[in-house]
């Protein structure tokens, strides 16, 4: 059988493209998909995030029904139909995942979390190295081979889901086409049109607050909002002198940026002697904030916080997923049990005094 015209064009592009990526780490393009049967957690029934390496560039859920860019990728000079195509493809995957969840519920008692990690990276010759693995309730149970068009695995549930999807018209062909053709096309497109986004730098805005602690102490919370890249260094100052970095944590926002906070226990009544300072790639010099005095970087902090209320500021699995993607683990499976369920909610473990209020993690409309 002859190769289709799009396939010929892609092959020529992969051959003719200068080998400029060879000297640098090759970024994978990955989609993390998840569907749940138990909606009591307040999560959507289906959601997806798209990643270029450890940088999130896309979000989608069944409530909004549109694929949206994240972070600096909002300004990527994409072709006009690109996000419509992403939306169409993710709606198809949403249908497959939700049908699988319903079928599992009908045949097996229990609740289910079905996840997929689909994507590709470019081999040294710029051909596609596809990934298509699936997990059920936090454990890998199935793989898809795009060259044979088969879903396979050792679990009984593999037969249930795999046979269901094999019966769907064109499902295997579309999945193979996505992994071998569409995915490398998109990855090349992002590298060509949005290469500068990989060097995106967004400076943080900050605030420092205090709350009562135990045994006559106070707890200072230094929070940094809406910054990228995620590496950020905290420092507490007492009367202008370094007084430690506190206990620090970092997590992703749903818009591709990050938030972080650090906690320091001090003597009650001593709070106003302290300042908080951060160092970040997006800042020309360290940014320092006094207690209860919002600092300004390149954008007023009020605008940053208000903006957080208007965008999707938390993606399901955000904290745990980002940490696993960044650490290079093979699959960011979430079990939706124990502590994992907390990582699926807005803002991770951001302290209440540092978190913008009134945020809906999955708004149905923009």
Swiss-Prot record:
Which keywords does this Swiss-Prot/TrEMBL entry list?
A: Cell membrane, Disulfide bond, Endosome, Glycoprotein, IgG-binding protein, Immunoglobulin domain, Membrane, Phosphoprotein, Receptor, Signal, Transmembrane, Transmembrane helix
User: Per the record, a Pfam family?
Assistant: C1-set
Its record classes its membrane topology as: Single-pass type I membrane protein
Q: Where is this region: Alpha-2?
A: 112-201
Domain Ig-like C1-type positions: 203-290
Q: Which positions form S-S bridges?
A: 120-183, 222-276
In this protein, the residues bearing a glycan are 109, 126, 150, 247
Q: Where is this region: Alpha-1?
A: 23-111
* Top-level taxon: Eukaryota
Compartments annotated for it: namely: Cell membrane; Endosome membrane
What is the tissue localization of expression for this protein? Intestinal epithelium.
- Give the region (Disordered) as residue ranges: 344-366
Span-the-membrane segments of this chain are 299-322
Extracellular topological domain ranges are: 23-298
Q: Which GO terms describe its cellular component?
A: endosome membrane; external side of plasma membrane; extracellular space
Q: Assembly and interactions?
A: FcRn complex consists of two subunits: p51, and p14 which is equivalent to beta-2-microglobulin. It forms an MHC class I-like heterodimer. Interacts with albumin/ALB; this interaction regulates ALB homeostasis.
- According to its UniProt record, which protein family does this protein belong to? Belongs to the immunoglobulin superfamily.
Q: What role does this protein play?
A: Cell surface receptor that transfers passive humoral immunity from the mother to the newborn. Binds to the Fc region of monomeric immunoglobulin gamma and mediates its selective uptake from milk. IgG in the milk is bound at the apical surface of the intestinal epithelium. The resultant FcRn-IgG complexes are transcytosed across the intestinal epithelium and IgG is released from FcRn into blood or tissue fluids. Throughout life, contributes to effective humoral immunity by recycling IgG and extending its half-life in the circulation.
Q: What is this protein called?
A: IgG receptor FcRn large subunit p51
Source organism per UniProt: Rattus norvegicus (Rat)
What's the source species' lineage?
Answer: Eukaryota, Metazoa, Chordata, Craniata, Vertebrata
């Amino acid at each position: 059988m002859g190769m289709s015209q799009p396939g010929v064009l892609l092959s020529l592009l992969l051959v003719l493209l200068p080998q400029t990526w060879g000297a640098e780490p090759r970024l994978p393009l990955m989609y993390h998909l998840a569907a749940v049967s138990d909606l009591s957690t307040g999560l959507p029934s289906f959601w997806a995030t798209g990643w270029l390496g450890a940088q999130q560039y896309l979000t989608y859920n069944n409530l909004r029904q549109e694929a949206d860019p994240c972070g600096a990728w909002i300004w990527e000079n994409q072709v006009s139909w690109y996000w419509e195509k992403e939306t169409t493809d993710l709606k198809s995957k949403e249908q497959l995942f939700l049908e699988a969840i319903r079928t599992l519920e009908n045949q097996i008692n229990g609740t289910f979390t079905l996840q997929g990690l689909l994507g590709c990276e470019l081999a040294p010759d710029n051909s596609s190295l596809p990934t298509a693995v699936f997990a059920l309730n936090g454990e890998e149970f199935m793989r898809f081979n795009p060259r044979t068009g088969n879903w396979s695995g050792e679990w009984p549930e593999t037969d249930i889901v795999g046979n269901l999807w094999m019966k769907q018209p064109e499902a295997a062909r579309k999945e193979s086409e996505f992994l071998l053709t569409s995915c490398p096309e998109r990855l090349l497109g992002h590298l060509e049109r949005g290469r500068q986004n990989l060097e995106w730098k967004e400076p943080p805005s900050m605030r420092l607050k205090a709350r009562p602690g135990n045994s006559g102490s106070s707890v200072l919370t230094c929070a940094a909002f809406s910054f990228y890249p995620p590496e950020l260094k905290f420092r507490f100052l007492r009367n202008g002198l370094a007084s430690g970095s506190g206990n620090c944590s970092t997590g992703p926002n749903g818009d591709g940026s990050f938030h972080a906070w650090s906690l320091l226990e001090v003597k009650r009544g001593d709070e106003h002697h302290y300042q908080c300072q951060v160092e970040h790639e997006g800042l020309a010099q360290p940014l320092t904030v006094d207690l209860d005095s919002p600092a300004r970087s390149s954008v007023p902090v009020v605008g940053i916080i208000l903006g957080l209320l208007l965008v999707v500021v938390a993606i399901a699995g955000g904290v745990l997923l980002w940490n696993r993607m960044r650490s290079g683990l093979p699959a960011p499976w979430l079990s939706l049990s124990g502590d994992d369920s907390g990582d699926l909610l807005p803002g991770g473990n951001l302290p209440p005094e540092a978190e913008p209020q009134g945020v809906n993690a999955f708004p149905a409309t923009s």
